[in-house]
Amino acid sequence: MIRVGIVGATGYTGIELFRLLKKHPSAKIVYMSSRTYAGKKMMEVYPSTLEEAVLEDFDSRKISESCDVVFTALPAGVSYRLAMELQNVKIIDLGADFRFDDPNTYAEWYGNKLEDYNSTERVYGLPELYRDSIKNARIVGNPGCYPTSVILALTPALKSGIVEVDTIVVDSKSGVSGAGRKETLDYTFSEVNENLRPYNVAKHRHVPEMEQELKKIAGKDVKVIFTPHLVPMTRGILSTIYVKTNASLEKIHRIYQEFYAGEPFVHVLPLGVFPSTKWCYGSNHVFIGMQLEERTGTLILMSAIDNLVKGASGQAIQNMNIMFDLKETEGLESLPIYP
């Protein structure tokens, strides 16, 4: 049985880790910490958990002695500092601290300088692309939610060289839980309900993460124009991507089917069928659809994920399964909740 710790257990990604790990047949939660709610029972914070375990302060020695792997679900800059105290434990970080190859890029976009950053010690945790590296990693930087939806949707097209990469336009819609569990006016009911708005236009922190990984896939520089929008729903991301191509829709669709054949969580939809966030709700599944705008030679790709599962906690557990040589789908077999 894998002994698991969750640092930052009371945020939305933390509680999603708890929900998924409680039904994982090969994992046991032995440690949970919360800076805000230390000393309280989990069920005092989330009554739905029925969990009597008491949340603790961060204790590096206790984690090192009692855990085989720790999930860190913390603000930018915090995970890296705490992870440096945990030298004998596998770490899966759901924040941004271990996603970047170049610490200067991270510092530029997140405003935090990571001292003594060793990019060779960490692996970018997108299983469909890097499972062989993840298997032997000690530290995994779990991808961001938007990058997950965009990278998976673009990878087959970029790898096959059938699209232009100088300008890729991405329009994404996300549920409010993507902003985290915090008291902010912009995310109150009256501000969000019956409202749709863009945010962080042309300056979202996920852009350099997308470009870093897409460059590796394409083998050359990739530029992404990214506009995220907040929509009045709890979970889900729908990304619509526009990219130029000379290939036929049938050829592109065949490339995608072949690339993702055998992947347990990525589903390429039949032509004429387009994804819905409702199909992913509460699950680790990804749905990808496509259409060709023939007048302009524009390939329109669409992907849907649950931002808290495949976009965060579910993908983190998928990475854990790989790191411990388990079946990749273990603990993640649940179908989406519908309706």
Curated annotation (Swiss-Prot):
Q: Which InterPro entries match?
A: AGPR_AS, AGPR_type-1, NAD(P)-bd_dom_sf, NAGSA_dehydrogenase, Semialdehyde_DH_NAD-bd
Q: Which UniProt keywords apply?
A: Amino-acid biosynthesis, Arginine biosynthesis, Cytoplasm, NADP, Oxidoreductase
Main EC class the enzyme belongs to: oxidoreductase
The Enzyme Commission number assigned here is 1.2.1.38
> What exactly does this protein do?
Catalyzes the NADPH-dependent reduction of N-acetyl-5-glutamyl phosphate to yield N-acetyl-L-glutamate 5-semialdehyde.
Entries under PANTHER family matching the protein: N-ACETYL-GAMMA-GLUTAMYL-PHOSPHATE REDUCTASE, CHLOROPLASTIC-RELATED (PTHR32338:SF10), N-ACETYL-GAMMA-GLUTAMYL-PHOSPHATE REDUCTASE, CHLOROPLASTIC-RELATED-RELATED (PTHR32338)
- Record field: catalytic activity: N-acetyl-L-glutamate 5-semialdehyde + phosphate + NADP(+) = N-acetyl-L-glutamyl 5-phosphate + NADPH + H(+)
Has the keyword Amino-acid biosynthesis been applied to this entry? yes
Cell compartments where the protein resides: Cytoplasm
Put simply, this protein is called N-acetyl-gamma-glutamyl-phosphate reductase
The organism's place on the tree of life at top rank:
Bacteria
An example of a Pfam family matching this protein is Semialdhyde_dh
Query: What's a single GO MF annotation on this record?
Result: NAD binding
